[in-house]
């Protein structure tokens, strides 16, 4: 069964064809990073206009790469939230138009669930129950999965998401956008020598990174940062220490079989290394190309929802504020 996935929640226009939820036949992404980097962040209006220009060519390219026509597509899976409203609308309207014109079933996919399903495209099928650490620019969640479509939120950020914290730290240190990769690169040439705080929030699986960001800002303002690379390494280590420690504690408490890593921040080298080395449980870590926004993960998630009877009407709407558990 072939699923066409469409993703346009932020600043990537993406389309993919995935067979049976696990085999990627194509995965095309048109990135807007170069456009938004001059502004130091994503400009919603600019993102929407670029999606309009890119969406149909990207879908066409995905079908060509997969050597597939619409007559072989069993369903169209499209991200309907969370994300930027104007960006989401472009992908959803394209999916609706194709579904209506071709008589193909439509499946709405939660972008956060899509990130998790990168682990079904990584060569080994995860075991339930599993704990997923989803870390991105807008979300930092610990989610228990007992089966397909079964999500229980165990922990979340109370302020800044991990990816947002990296972006802000990069701006404080004068590094480039996007901040996560910039911090990661700078850290390769630095040492984690700065004493930065870690917010543990005893008795909770929640996260908090705003205090860490403020502490870094104060050090910079007071002239106590001599090396940008050391500061980046210190900030990254503080974030990763909290992410890994709280994930392992949560996994032990809920007696899961496996830990899954997902989201854009899952591309961080230290996080991937530290979680793998410190976990007593098997850890599934997707290839870096599947951590950032793409449509293959949307198609995979959509497949499992579709075979379980999930299908949406053509009046389905975008949900910009959708959470991992709705």
From Swiss-Prot:
Organism of this sequence: Dehalococcoides mccartyi (strain ATCC BAA-2266 / KCTC 15142 / 195) (Dehalococcoides ethenogenes (strain 195))
Localization of this protein: Cytoplasm
Pfam families xrefs: TsaD
SUPFAM superfamilies named among the record's database cross-references: Actin-like ATPase domain (SSF53067)
Record's protein name: tRNA N6-adenosine threonylcarbamoyltransferase
Keywords: Acyltransferase, Cytoplasm, Iron, Metal-binding, Transferase, tRNA processing
Gene coding for it: tsaD
Residue sites binding Fe cation per the record: 111, 115, 293
Catalytic activity: L-threonylcarbamoyladenylate + adenosine(37) in tRNA = N(6)-L-threonylcarbamoyladenosine(37) in tRNA + AMP + H(+)
């Amino acid at each position: 069964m072939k699923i066409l996935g469409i993703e346009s929640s932020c600043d990537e226009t993406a389309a993919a064809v995935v067979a049976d939820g696990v085999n990627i036949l194509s995965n095309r992404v048109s990135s807007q990073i170069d456009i938004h980097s001059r502004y130091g962040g994503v400009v919603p209006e600019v993102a929407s206009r670029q999606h309009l220009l890119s969406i149909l060519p990207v879908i066409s390219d995905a079908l060509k790469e997969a050597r597939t026509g619409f007559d072989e597509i069993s369903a169209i899976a499209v991200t309907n939230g969370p994300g930027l409203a104007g960006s989401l609308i472009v992908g959803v309207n394209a999916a609706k138009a194709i579904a209506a014109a071709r008589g193909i079933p439509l499946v709405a996919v939660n972008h956060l669930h899509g990130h998790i399903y990168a682990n079904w495209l990584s060569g080994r099928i995860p075991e339930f129950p599993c704990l997923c650490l989803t870390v991105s620019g807008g979300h930092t969640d610990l989610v228990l999965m007992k089966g397909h479509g079964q999500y229980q939120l165990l922990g979340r950020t109370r302020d800044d998401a991990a990816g947002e914290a990296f972006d802000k730290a990069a701006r404080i240190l004068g590094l480039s956008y996007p901040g996560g990769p910039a911090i990661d690169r700078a850290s390769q040439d630095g040492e984690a020598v700065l004493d930065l705080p870690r917010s543990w929030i005893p008795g909770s699986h929640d996260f908090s990174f705003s205090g860490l960001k403020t502490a870094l800002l104060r050090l910079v303002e007071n002239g106590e940062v001599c090396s940008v690379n050391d500061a980046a390494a210190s900030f990254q280590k503080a974030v990763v220490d909290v992410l890994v420690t709280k994930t392992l504690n949560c996994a032990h408490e809920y007696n899961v079989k496996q830990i899954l890593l997902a989201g854009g921040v899952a591309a961080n080298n230290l996080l991937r290394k530290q979680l793998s080395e410190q976990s007593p449980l098997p850890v599934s870590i997707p290839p870096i190309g599947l951590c950032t926004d793409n449509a293959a993960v949307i198609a995979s998630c959509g497949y499992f929802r579709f075979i379980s009877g999930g299908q949406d009407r053509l009046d389905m709407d975008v949900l910009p504020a959708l959470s991992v558990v709705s």
